[in-house]
């Protein structure tokens, strides 16, 4: 009982204290309304001030660091940059009282050594390079001019030809050339080159000479180029040995073709000389043949003399070059040389372009494993006039750099047009004759194959159609050749199949036949009888029976009926399905929807439609 009364007293005290707290809180809120502006200002200003202070500190640090970096780079021993400036040009080149080499100094530009290159190990080498850059040394212009002069002397032979260079007509009969003493070394080099194909000892000597030549060229250039390290020299020697081995292997495969071509060319030259001799004996007064022979002999000798000078700059790749045909005696620089003032055109009957026989040896070295046989169907005989320079006042002072390429043909074979060919590139046409599937090697044999195969270039098991013209494919050791290298051996002209045979006997069209047709599919194959029944109702069947054109159902009784009874018999509905007449719209209705899209117009149109009628019979079934 006592605790119960005490609880009541405490509850009364709490209830009495509640209004006092509400009064205190109200008074407190009313007092702090005056100081709210100060708190807002402090809350905004303090963060902004802190952010400004932090940003200013960061900017000061960055500015000091950027200002400190250039000073550190100036004293950095390992810094490599564009801070070193080249010194000024030599003042002596602009002075009036200069020595005899003033013109040379004008092109030296201060005597900078363009071939002096600093190493990139440290900055000290670059500083030494800057100190030594004022030392007088041959400039790039002078070196290039000297090199161009040497090349011009080697490429263009001298215009002064001695009388010993001329070849008499008697020397043609003995097939001997009179060589001047100053070019006597040229004949020896040519003899060594011709004999090297048959004598293996000479081949070894020539290869040794090529190695010595490479070494001499390398040592001669070593004065201008920086010294190589031992590792670089070892790499160079290793590469040189690899190339020598490759050249020795290639020499063994090319010797036979080179020797045969040299022999064939020599036989042709002897035949032409004999023919010229015979014709000159028949016509002693005719000097045109003598001039032509004399003109050709001087051309041969001049090219031999120029070849000796160019031989110094040849490398070990001489063995990879196939000798050009004997008829064309024109050097590379003759295209841009001087043109003679006096010319004459040799008639077509005396000159024509020749082409090697179809069964000749291969002239391709990079892909020597393939045969370059030329089909007779793709060769057309042609003739073209060839320009030759006339000789003036009985002296042949013409050089090979001033004349066009001349062709000398045997006059005994002028009437035989089958011996003269001109290689016109003809367009290749489809279809392509593929190899048999039996020639397709196994996957393990692809590694050891000498030619690249295409898996799509093999035809399938079924035999090809008889209309295709079969061309025998070239093979090497039972391996079919690649059509990319010899397309003329794999492609032939398409055969035209008459349209009557295609209509009578159906066959699968070939890809090139599909391109010739406008329609890719045969329309006759699409005309198949339908196996489905057309959609409709019993009304369509009855209408078809009562049509006047149907003779099987038209009788005298049906024709005697009035049209009203026929229309009533046709218009009755069998089911609630829509018919064709339900879809059709009579012309009196007009548009399907009204022009004004209002609900009243739409209701009026739906209520007055002519094709919607409800009968009690249809209502029951629907």
From Swiss-Prot:
The keyword S-adenosyl-L-methionine does not apply. Residues 181-233 are annotated as: Disordered. It is a single-pass membrane protein. Residues 181-201 have a biased composition (Polar residues). Residues 202-214 have a biased composition (Basic and acidic residues). It holds the Pfam family SKG6. This is Protein TOS2. It comes from Saccharomyces cerevisiae (strain ATCC 204508 / S288c). The gene is TOS2.
């Amino acid at each position: 009982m006592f605790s119960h009364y005490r609880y009541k007293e405490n509850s009364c005290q709490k209830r009495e204290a509640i209004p006092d707290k509400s009064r205190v809180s109200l008074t407190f809120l009313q007092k702090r309304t005056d100081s709210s502006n100060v708190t807002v200002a402090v809350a905004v200003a303090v963060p902004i001030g802190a952010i400004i202070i932090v940003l200013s500190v960061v900017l000061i640090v960055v500015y000091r660091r950027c200002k400190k970096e250039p000073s550190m780079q100036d004293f950095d021993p390992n810094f490599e940059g564009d801070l070193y400036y080249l010194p000024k040009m030599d003042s002596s080149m602009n002075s009036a009282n200069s020595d005899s080499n003033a013109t040379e100094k004008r092109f030296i530009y201060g005597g900078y050594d363009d071939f002096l290159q600093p190493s990139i190990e440290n900055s000290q080498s670059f500083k030494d390079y800057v100190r030594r850059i004022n030392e007088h040394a041959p400039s790039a212009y002078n070196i290039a001019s000297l090199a161009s002069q040497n090349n011009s002397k080697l490429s263009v032979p001298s215009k002064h030809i001695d009388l010993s260079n001329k070849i008499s007509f008697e020397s043609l009969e003995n097939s001997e050339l009179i060589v001047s003493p100053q070019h006597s070394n040229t004949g020896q080099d040519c003899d060594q080159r011709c004999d090297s194909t048959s004598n293996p000892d000479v081949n070894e000597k020539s290869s040794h000479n090529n190695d010595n030549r490479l070494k001499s060229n390398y040592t001669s250039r070593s004065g201008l180029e920086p010294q190589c390290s031992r590792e670089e020299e070892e790499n160079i020697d290793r590469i040189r040995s690899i190339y020598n081995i490759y050249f020795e292997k290639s020499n063994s495969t090319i010797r036979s073709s080179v020797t045969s071509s040299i022999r064939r060319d020599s036989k042709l030259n002897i035949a032409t000389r004999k023919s010229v001799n015979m014709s000159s004996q028949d016509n002693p007064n005719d000097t045109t043949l003598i001039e032509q022979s004399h003109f050709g002999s001087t051309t041969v000798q001049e090219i031999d003399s120029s070849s000796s000078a160019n031989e110094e700059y040849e490398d070990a790749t001489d063995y990879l070059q196939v000798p050009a045909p004997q008829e064309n005696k024109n050097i590379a620089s003759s295209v841009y040389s001087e043109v003679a003032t006096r010319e004459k055109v040799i008639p077509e009957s005396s000159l024509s372009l020749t082409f090697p026989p179809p069964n000749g040896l291969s002239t391709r070295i990079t892909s020597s494993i393939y045969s370059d046989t030329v089909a007779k169907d793709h060769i057309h005989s042609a003739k073209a006039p060839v320009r030759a320079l006339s000789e003036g006042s009985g002296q042949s002072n013409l050089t090979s750099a001033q004349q066009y390429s001349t062709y000398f043909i045997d006059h005994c074979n002028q009437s035989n047009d089958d011996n003269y060919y001109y290689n016109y590139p003809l367009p290749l046409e489809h279809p392509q004759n593929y190899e048999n599937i039996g020639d397709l090697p196994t996957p393990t044999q692809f590694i050891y194959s000498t030619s690249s195969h295409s898996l799509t270039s093999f035809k399938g098991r079924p035999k090809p159609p008889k209309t295709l013209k079969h061309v025998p494919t070239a093979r090497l050791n039972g391996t079919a050749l690649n059509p990319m290298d010899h397309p003329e051996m794999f492609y032939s002209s398409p055969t035209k199949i008459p349209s009557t045979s295609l209509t009578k006997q159906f066959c699968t069209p070939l890809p090139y036949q599909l391109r010739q047709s406008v329609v890719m599919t045969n329309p006759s194959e699409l005309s198949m009888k339908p196996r489905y029944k057309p959609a409709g109702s019993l009304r369509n069947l009855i209408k078809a029976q009562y049509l006047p054109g149907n003779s099987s159902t038209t009788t005298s009784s049906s024709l005697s009926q009035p049209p009203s009874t026929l229309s009533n018999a046709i218009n009755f509905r069998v089911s609630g399905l829509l018919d064709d007449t339900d879809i059709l719209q009579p012309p009196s209705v007009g548009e399907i929807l009204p022009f004004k899209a209002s609900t009243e117009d739409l209701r009026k149109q739906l209520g007055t439609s002519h094709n919607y009628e409800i009968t009690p019979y249809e209502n029951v079934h629907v």
